[in-house]
């Protein structure tokens, strides 16, 4: 869930009253939000960087509020305050209007060169806006929140905002070779080519995460005005020429991307949130966008649509008994203007452009439940009685866990995600040979892939507990994930059992004995006949030569055991010998 930081006093001013922390926490809960933390800029810096860095930072109280990931209209103070005001029935939800300019309409022309890079673009103008320092900060913060959420870190959509008074339309959205693009980027004092900028931003903590989006493309997207001034090179950086400030009065907003629907949603959210500060409140000036095929469209769309939902459906799904009129009132409090029509059981719900999250009747039902109050819904016994039972795989896991502990091993619970190094380099494998499922744009280097083996997690656990008395005997029974083209999701989970023994001697006999005990518990006899188990000498990059065996049950390989190679032990920052066992337990079901 995204977290929005707002100044407490500024929020209370927008709400028209003050609250105690407990009262505001309760209000957030009623509205489907969560007050995550009460802090200040000084406390945040002190916590993250130390007390020395916090000198001179603001002591203004900040509320950190967790917002549902699909409620883009609540990602800034303006939307949050507006939503709460409507919820408390202090104001009515505003009506957003698109207006045509008094003079010529601004145009954004898209050329065919953008087709293979970022083919879509939409635009709008906020006219006669009045910024304060706080409003300006909120405007920038909203763009960043949208970039991180619906825009998927700018991969799907990138937002550019510009001081229209410094530019001259019509505007052209095209794509050129990096060496042919030269401009002065935001907050820089000299011009650079696109190639030079990509090299400079590789060390920029903020922008380096977005370079991969276009870095390998032969052409880079760029937006010019009629005088050849560069507005932006999406999704990387805006030009410094059209930089907006607190004194900016007219803003040209462009959204480019690979997802047309999301680009329109992002544009609608920005203009609906900040048209509140325009001279003519909640009005947005239209922009004509000309596609490569010559077709013209006008944006923003600001669509209002109507949905029909039956009152008895809402009552049944939520578990309440409310009249259609009361349900319509509840929905109106959630910025969904509603009225009872037809036979008295039908409710017509108007979906505003700020509520792109409402795509189905169930979304309307959910909002009715939130407005009614989850704590007000009476608990009832189900009409049918069922007997719960464990999945066979989970039952087998629980039985084995108990006996592994009885055998003197301690259970560890490790992360399902790990680094590529952990499952490949450190085990002497190439990453391509692991069939690992990779995480797109991982947050940290420690969580790049889903684990294909439980062994690295246990070895890292031992490394973190090296000062504990020897021997260390650990086990884990959990899932690993590998690619599988035969599955609809392209991957499959397998339940593995892994155990390690770490001591001054390898203790292969301990691990071998544990295997025998596991097979005894599973009623699998030794030997090749009658589906028995056996081990055969094998080789593995993670194991010491001549000290590795493959485990077979009924002729099927289920795993390996052996003494780990010294290189593996060293790479996991260990100093003592170690033996391990890892098997797939699903064949025993």
UniProtKB/Swiss-Prot annotation:
NCBIfam families: pheT_arch. Keywords: Aminoacyl-tRNA synthetase, ATP-binding, Cytoplasm, Ligase, Magnesium, Metal-binding, Nucleotide-binding, Protein biosynthesis. Residues 302-379 form the B5 domain. Gene3D superfamilies: 3.30.56.10, Bira Bifunctional Protein, Domain 2, Phenylalanyl-trna Synthetase, Chain B, domain 3. GO terms for cellular component: phenylalanine-tRNA ligase complex. It comes from Mus musculus (Mouse). Heterotetramer; dimer of two heterodimers formed by FARSA and FARSB. Belongs to the phenylalanyl-tRNA synthetase beta subunit family. Type 2 subfamily. GO terms for biological process: phenylalanyl-tRNA aminoacylation; protein heterotetramerization. It is found in: Cytoplasm. This is Phenylalanine--tRNA ligase beta subunit. The lineage of its organism: Eukaryota, Metazoa, Chordata, Craniata, Vertebrata. Mg(2+) binds at residues 357, 363, 366-367. InterPro entries: aa-tRNA-synth_II/BPL/LPL, B3/B4_tRNA-bd, DNA-bd_dom_put_sf, Phe-tRNA-ligase_IIc_bsu, Phe-tRNA-synth_IIc_bsu_arc_euk, Phe-tRNA_synthase-like_B3/B4, PheRS_beta_core, PhetRS_B1. Its EC number is 6.1.1.20. GO terms for molecular function: ATP binding; magnesium ion binding; phenylalanine-tRNA ligase activity; RNA binding. Its cofactor is Mg(2+). Its main location: cytoplasm. It catalyses: tRNA(Phe) + L-phenylalanine + ATP = L-phenylalanyl-tRNA(Phe) + AMP + diphosphate + H(+).
């Amino acid at each position: 869930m995204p977290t929005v930081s707002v100044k407490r006093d500024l929020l209370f001013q927008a709400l028209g009253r003050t609250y105690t922390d407990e009262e505001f926490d309760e209000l957030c809960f009623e509205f489907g939000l969560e007050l995550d933390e009460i802090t200040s800029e000084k406390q945040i810096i002190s916590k993250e960087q130390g007390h020395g860095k916090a000198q001179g930072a603001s002591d203004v109280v900040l509320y950190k509020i967790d917002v549902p990931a699909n409620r883009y209209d609540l990602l800034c103070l303006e939307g949050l305050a507006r939503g709460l005001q409507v919820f408390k029935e202090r104001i009515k939800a505003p009506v957003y209007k698109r207006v045509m300019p008094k003079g010529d309409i601004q145009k954004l022309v898209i050329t065919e060169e953008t087709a293979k890079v970022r083919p879509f673009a939409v635009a709008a103008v906020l006219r006669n806006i009045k910024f304060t320092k706080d409003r300006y900060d909120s405007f920038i913060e909203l763009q960043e929140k949208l970039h991180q959420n619906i825009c998927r870190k700018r991969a799907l959509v990138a937002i550019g905002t510009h001081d229209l008074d410094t530019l001259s339309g019509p505007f052209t959205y095209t794509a050129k070779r990096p060496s042919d693009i030269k401009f002065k980027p935001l907050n820089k004092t000299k011009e650079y080519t696109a190639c030079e900028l990509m090299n400079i931003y590789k060390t920029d903590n903020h922008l380096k995460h977005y370079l991969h989006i276009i870095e390998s493309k032969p052409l880079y997207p760029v937006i010019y005005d009629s005088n050849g001034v560069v507005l932006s090179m999406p999704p990387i950086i805006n030009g410094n020429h059209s930089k907006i400030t607190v004194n900016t009065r007219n803003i040209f907003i462009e959204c480019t991307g690979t997802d047309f629907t999301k680009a329109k949603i992002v544009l609608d959210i920005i203009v609906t949130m900040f048209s509140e500060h325009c001279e003519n409140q909640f009005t947005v000036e239209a922009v004509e966008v000309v596609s490569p095929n010559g077709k013209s469209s006008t944006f923003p769309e600001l669509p209002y649509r109507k949905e029909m939902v039956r009152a008895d459906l809402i009552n049944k799904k939520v578990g309440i008994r409310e009249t259609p009129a009361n349900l319509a009132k509840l929905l109106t409090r959630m910025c969904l203007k509603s009225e009872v029509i037809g036979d008295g059981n039908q409710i017509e719900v108007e979906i505003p452009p700020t509520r792109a999250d409402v795509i189905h009747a169930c979304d309307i039902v959910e909002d009715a439940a939130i407005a009614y109050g989850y704590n007000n819904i009476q608990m009832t016994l189900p009409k049918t009685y069922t007997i719960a039972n464990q999945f066979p795989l989970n039952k087998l896991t629980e039985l084995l866990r108990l006996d592994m502990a009885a055998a003197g091993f301690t259970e560890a619970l490790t992360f399902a995600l790990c680094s590529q190094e952990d499952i490949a380099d450190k085990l002497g494998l190439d990453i391509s040979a692991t069939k690992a499922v990779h995480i797109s744009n991982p947050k940290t280097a420690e969580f790049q892939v889903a684990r294909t083996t439980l062994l690295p997690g246990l070895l890292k656990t031992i490394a973190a507990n090296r000062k504990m008395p020897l021997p260390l005997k650990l086990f884990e029974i959990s899932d690993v994930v590998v690619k599988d083209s035969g599955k609809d999701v392209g991957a499959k989970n397998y339940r593995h059992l892994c155990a390690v023994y770490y001591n001054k001697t390898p203790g292969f006999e301990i691990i071998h004995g544990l295997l025998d005990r596991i097979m005894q518990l599973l009623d699998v006899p030794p030997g090749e006949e009658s589906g028995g188990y056996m081990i055969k000498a094998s080789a593995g990059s993670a194991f010491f030569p001549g000290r590795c065996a493959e485990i077979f049950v009924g002729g099927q390989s289920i795993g390996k055991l052996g003494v780990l190679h010294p290189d593996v032990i060293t790479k996991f920052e260990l100093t003592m010998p170690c033996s391990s066992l890892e098997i797939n337990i699903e064949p025993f079901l």
